Amino acid sequence: SCQKWMWTCDQKRPCCEDMVCKLWCKIIK
């Protein structure tokens, strides 16, 4: 399952497409 609203992401729980966590992922990395 993918993450929808978490601020962190990893290979085990990747962000869902077009979700908030994906934006945070890019910002943090």
Swiss-Prot record:
Annotated family: Belongs to the phrixotoxin family.
Tissue expression: Expressed by the venom gland.
This protein's name: Beta/kappa-theraphotoxin-Gi1a
The keyword Disulfide bond appears for this protein: yes
Classification lineage: Eukaryota, Metazoa, Ecdysozoa, Arthropoda, Chelicerata
Gene Ontology cellular-component terms listed: extracellular region
GO molecular function, one term: toxin activity
Domain of life of the organism encoding this protein: Eukaryota
Keywords, alphabetical: Disulfide bond, Ion channel impairing toxin, Knottin, Neurotoxin, Potassium channel impairing toxin, Secreted, Toxin, Voltage-gated potassium channel impairing toxin, Voltage-gated sodium channel impairing toxin
